[in-house]
Regions:
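Binuclear metal-dependent hydrolase catalytic cores
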Residues: 1-185, 242, 255-294
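Cap/insert and terminal regions of metallo-dependent hydrolase folds
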Residues: 190-279
């Protein structure tokens, strides 16, 4: 029997979460998941990770998960701040094997962020809860095997500040592909330029689902290492066979503003959607596409 494949949006707000949660699009920082039991691949570990790990305790479709691979894009804390709230650190004897993957810079930021006295070291939290907790260093241009999935990495264009005072981060984009199944691409946080287009096209080639940094409405607004809904629309036109999700919504934008931008740039594009939290997609193998799940 073919094992179902699910893609879920758990956190789609960029940079910081909205408090109190007023948005119907996104309130939690970045977190997405790709499930094909017994393997669960997690893209970033923002505050959406708490929602994902709670679902793992309550939804039957996660019952067969034995190994979890968390793919961190970069060192900014909004992409790993959810680790301390992961349900697997607070329930005994879960039997899970969890591996945190990322660049040296990101893994070191996580280690320092959860070191004493700032918090409890993650390895200490894992004692008696997880079967195993490991870290694995990745670099741009790698290809690794995680369960049945092939993971390719690339360098993304992300930085803090502006002009000559920009501080660049070691940021990784990911392409997850399954032999005979889907290819899913995650490019966030990322500011597209003419120099990055070749990489973007290579990572999205023949794919079925693409998640992009769409922090701003327009390409002219690109700054601080972030993209736009307008650029997401460009990718959707170039990849008509893929569902393109515009995520990392800027925290200053209301739902109305985000939807207006989507209607303006997505006119005529049936394959461009907003990344909306708690929305789930299931892989339709005969059609070779993802469709919204009715769960």
């Amino acid at each position: 029997m073919r094992r179902p494949i699910y893609f879920d949006v758990w956190g789609s707000r960029g940079s910081r979460s909205i408090v109190p949660p007023l948005s119907r699009i996104g309130n939690r920082t970045s977190c997405y998941s790709l499930l094909r039991a017994p393997t669960l691949l997690v893209l970033d570990a923002g505050l959406g990770l708490a929602a994902l790990t709670h679902a793992m305790s309550t939804q039957k479709r996660f019952g067969g998960v034995r190994e979890v691979h968390v793919l961190i894009t970069h060192a900014h804390m909004d992409h790993w701040e959810g680790l301390k709230d992961a349900d697997w650190f607070w329930r005994p004897n879960r039997g899970l094997e969890v591996t945190l993957h990322g660049a040296d810079e990101a893994l070191e930021a996580i280690r320092l962020g959860y070191s004493h006295p700032l918090y409890v070291p993650l390895r200490r939290l894992a004692e008696g809860k997880l079967r195993r907790l490991e870290t694995r260093r990745l670099r741009a241009g790698q290809r690794v095997q995680l369960g049945d999935w092939t993971v390719e990495t690339c360098a993304l264009n992300h930085y803090s500040g502006a002009g000559a005072r920009r501080l660049f981060l070691s940021t990784l984009g990911y392409r997850l592909s399954l032999d005979g199944g889907p290819a899913v691409t995650y490019l966030s946080d990322h500011e597209p330029t003419s120099r990055t287009r070749k990489t973007e096209r290579r990572m999205t080639r023949d794919g079925q689902l693409v998640v992009l940094d769409a922090h701003f409405p327009d390409i002219s607004h690109h700054a601080f290492g972030h993209g736009s809904q307008e650029h997401a629309a460009v990718v959707a036109r170039e990849c008509p066979g893929a569902l393109v999700l515009a995520g990392h919504h800027g925290p200053a934008f209301t739902d109305s503003q985000i939807r207006v931008s989507h209607r303006r740039h997505g006119r005529g594009l049936r394959n461009l959607e907003l990344a909306v939290e708690d929305r789930s997609y299931v892989w339709n193998a005969p059609r070779r596409s993802f469709a919204r799940s009715g769960r």
